[in-house]
Amino acid sequence: MKNTTGSLTVAFDIDGTWTLAPALFHQIACLFANSGWQVIIVTGRDQPERKIAGMLLWASWPVIVSGPLLKEEAARRAGYKVNVWIDDMPGMIQDCRILRGDGLLNA
């Protein structure tokens, strides 16, 4: 895993998350980075380079495209263990019985 130096990793989504307030999310990501966290971007689909460049301003955080995989799996395959996810669609991050409706909430 790429975050074996003891640092924690935060992953941001693009569409529906970062795109809602790019300047704000950039500041938040910088706060994480300046506090020693590793910042990555995990998106479900390919993004135009121009869009990525505009979003990240001067930062050079890795962008991982999950495609058909759950985002956690895509990040893992890219060598990252994510500790905190910032995403408007948590069901795209990892398999979750509660979100599927077969959890124990109704027990």
Residue ranges and their predicted role:
Residues 1-72:
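Alpha-helical substrate-recognition element adjacent to the catalytic core
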Residues 35, 48-107:
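C-terminal cap/substrate-recognition subdomain and adjoining C-terminal extension
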